[in-house]
Amino acid sequence: MNYQSEQTEYFEKLIEPEILTKLPRYDTFCELLEMCKNDYADLPAISDMVNTITYGELYDRIACRRNFLYRNGFKKGDIIAVLAPNSMYSMELYMAIPTAGCIVIMLPSAENAISRECLTALINKFDIKGLFINPEYKEVAEGQPVKVFDIHDTDNVPGPTADVTKDDIAVICFSVNNSPDNPYGAMLSHGAIMRAAHNGLFIPGHTYNQRTIAILPLSHVFGAIRGLLTCIYTGALVYACEDMSNIVFDIPKMKPTILTLVPGLAEMILSVARIKGKEFLEGIETIICGGAYCQPKLVKQAKDYGINLLVG
């Protein structure tokens, strides 16, 4: 029995053929962003709950950030870290750094997740050349042996995409299980990231016109790929969740149609719904739940609210 063939056939049936032809698997971040500029330019792309930018504006803002990198001497293969919560700015950097030919590493930004000593070990271990931070991390970043920039730093002039291939490293996924004196992470190429983002398209339900809240941090590989890049692939509107403690207020306000969560968060959200009522989850059609074991009871609880909870 050819399991691979059967699996491919099963997943391909989840998307209409004419839609699938419009969403080929791209090899690099650069190719994905070019498609977004051409096909989604006027659609809303990213929102911080107050300001919303279109895909055309996102493309231009990423290009200006690339020029900032070039102007500050970064070259192909340099590793650049970002220490900041989910925001419009950190999302721009997550895509600007690889399209400049550099390698991005998103660091966990939860309180006390990264100490000064751990950050120093990280910089030395990975030979990090630059660090973008939110202002609240100034103390941790002070005195580090690396160029430090504010998360808002950018240029007024756009810069071109670098000459990258699918085999060039794009992202280092920092492991949360690191010991402070021996940090490590997985190095993922442009091609690997794009394959994973494309694989995320194959779910039941409609492909386009989705709204999501990026709740999982970009330092979480599942959150960065399925929670952001797959949504970018389909021209979805992505709300940046800057503070996870606010999701109880953000969900009914933003009315997302799809969420990417870990089981603990899914359980919490469903528990809140039992208290606040079904209206709390109004609009949500799908929850993709991964990163850890998901109990069958969560699937049933979600189904009771008319939500398709997909484990994987």
Across the structure, where does each feature detected by a protein language model lie?
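Conserved AMP-binding/adenylation subdomain of ANL enzymes
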Residues: 194-211, 218-277, 283, 308
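ANL superfamily adenylate-forming
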Residues: 130-168, 194, 272-273
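A short helix-loop-beta submotif of the ANL/AMP-binding
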Residues: 66, 79, 85-109, 126-129, ...
